[in-house]
């Protein structure tokens, strides 16, 4: 149940992230951290990011670029790695036995792939 709640919070953050554009990784990190408690407009102003409703970022404001020449496949790859490292590793430690651990890893890995490719829904990881 805790993982479902955390995944829901992460999904909410991603929906917001698609509407904000920052000039740098520092700006993106600032915005993401600020959004934990702050409003979109406030965080965008403080972190020098721009909000857009079109889903396209203006020139000079990349959406998710981690490095200057990154592209979407790299972003999806790093998203999968981060999701698995933060969510799935935690679940492995919570498993009671090897079978439960195997099931958690399989379902969690699938959830991360769906999440990072943009087709995530709120599904239970124990289903």
Curated annotation (Swiss-Prot):
This is Alpha-hordothionin. Residues 1-18 form the signal peptide. SUPFAM superfamilies: Crambin-like. Residues 64-127 form a propeptide. It comes from the Eukaryota. Belongs to the plant thionin (TC 1.C.44) family. 4 C-C subfamily. PROSITE patterns: THIONIN (PS00271). It is found in: Secreted. Thionins are small plant proteins which are toxic to animal cells. They seem to exert their toxic effect at the level of the cell membrane. Their precise function is not known. The keyword Secreted applies. GO terms for biological process: defense response. Keywords: Disulfide bond, Plant defense, Secreted, Signal, Toxin. One of its GO terms (molecular function) is toxin activity. GO terms for cellular component: extracellular region. Disulfide bonds join 21-57, 22-49, 30-47, 34-43. Its main location: secreted.
């Amino acid at each position: 149940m805790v993982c479902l709640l955390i995944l829901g919070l992460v999904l909410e953050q991603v929906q917001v992230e698609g509407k904000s554009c920052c000039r740098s990784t520092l700006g993106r990190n600032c915005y993401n951290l600020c959004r934990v408690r702050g409003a979109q407009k406030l965080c965008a102003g403080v972190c020098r990011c721009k909000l857009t409703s079109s889903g396209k970022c203006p020139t000079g404001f990349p959406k998710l670029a981690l490095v200057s020449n990154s592209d979407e496949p790299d972003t999806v790859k790093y998203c999968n790695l981060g999701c698995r490292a933060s969510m799935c590793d935690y679940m492995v430690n919570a498993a009671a036995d090897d079978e439960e651990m195997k099931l958690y890893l399989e379902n969690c890995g699938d959830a991360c792939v769906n999440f990072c490719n943009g087709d995530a829904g709120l599904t239970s990881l124990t289903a």
